[in-house]
Amino acid sequence: MIALADCNNFYASCERVFQPWLQNVPIVVLSNNDGCVIARSNEAKKLGVPMGAPAFKYEKVFQKNNVYVFSANFALYGDLSKRVMSTISQEINRMEVYSIDEVFMDFSSVSLLKEKAQEVKAKVKKWTGIPISIGVAPTKALAKVANYYAKKYTKQGVLVLNNPSHIARALKKLPVGELWGVGRKYAKFLAQRGIVTAYDLIKLDESWVRSNMTVVGLRLVQELKGTSCFDIEPVSPKKKNICTSRSFGHKVRSYTELKEAVAAYATTCSQKLRGEGSCAAVVSVFLTTNPFNLSETQYRASRRVQLSIPTSDSLEIVKAAIEGLSGIYKKGLVYKKAGVIVSDIVPQNQVQLSLFDAVDRSKRKWLMSSVDTINTRMGKDKVRLAVQGFDRKWRLKQEHLSPCYTTRFSDLLTVSL
């Protein structure tokens, strides 16, 4: 048996942990630059605020209904996610972190399924303040189905689907578009052929499914029938590339501002590489103007820079990124977005050094480790490269950002005795 734990309205729940007066009031969380709605509390959903809604179009709705609006605080959400996963790991020996707010758990050795799920749910709520729902079933896909119903239709937030008749009933009521991995395109394709529910899907000939939905679709159908095709993967596969990109908070024209932004993004990529114990051999940079503003000159370009030796050193990766930027920057244009991608990633212990390497890698490794330690303890970018800048006018617009309660010393809550 496999269980899926899914945090309820995760971003909104994170905001409530340190602001308990937000319980039972409508909350929305906005995307980068406070553009669109990317998370909603149940109260906001009842007001008819859809996912992806442009924030400016719903300002009157927010004001009229006293909706609390937050800029996305990914530092807070990421840290609370780690705390949720750490708490669950103390109860479950074998688990797979599927996303920032989802984790699959191996329940094959659990005898009292519902009781164990309720125990995990209660512990996560007590230790982290985050509410979760848990669905338990024979396969990952069915666990997703069970979680869907646990979240929407049960008071306890826990549902076990292990009875064939109960599974069939659940699939008959489940819209095919709600299935794991079935996006809008496939949902529309299936609906046009009269396949409306998950139960309709599993009644199709498997050869037709494979032909029209690839082998991934076939495995989904087999999972819904109770045959396990996707095992628990305790260790996430190493990334093939890492990208850091952002839309700018205002119009950017100057090379200096672009250089600061690209240096900051390259530094973030380097930190992620070190966190994985990996190194990259290629650094790519891209720039784009605003594709939705046709009154301005349109431009999009990228440049790939090959490193002589794979590295995770911020100094080397930033240098390569700036080299790439200088090759694609055009004066006079208004830029909306930039990004850095590191690729050709290899494990750090498999890097082949050069006899003529001029870099003292042991000293650089110590330096990067020291910088990471300080920034982890004191807050992001407390120690940074000068080229990253300090004014940073290009940064994201975050007018509704909550404090980083768990990752920044200056934002720690204080208690008066």
Where are these regions (language model features)?
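Short Gly/Ser/Thr- and Asp/Glu-enriched loop/turn motifs at secondary-structure junctions
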Residues: Y98-E102, A137-K140, S278-V282, L333-K337
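Short, charged/polar surface micro-motifs in flexible loops or helix N-caps
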Residues: F10, N33-C36, N290-N293, I345-N349
